[in-house]
Amino acid sequence: MEIVQWILTHGSEVELTISWYDTNIEFTMYARSERRACRKTIDYHEVENFNNEVITLILDLMYEELLKENING
């Protein structure tokens, strides 16, 4: 539910793609207002308990990175 809430909160500002693979998960976030993107790939073995809370934290960090790029860019 945390991921759904995150998307409802930020979905008008960013486009999000989450790709699940055998060994990792890839997050790609695009700022809707500009042509900026942020991509993170996380190997499953790097995170002890990969759950919704961890995914939400990753999304928050990516969102902050996009905002920082918009301010500094």
Predicted features along the sequence, with ranges:
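Short intrinsically disordered terminal tails
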Residues: 1-2, 67-73
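Negatively charged, low-complexity tracts enriched in Asp/Glu with abundant Ser/Thr
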Residues: 1-17, 51-52, 60, 64
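Acidic, low-complexity, intrinsically disordered interaction modules
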Residues: 13-56
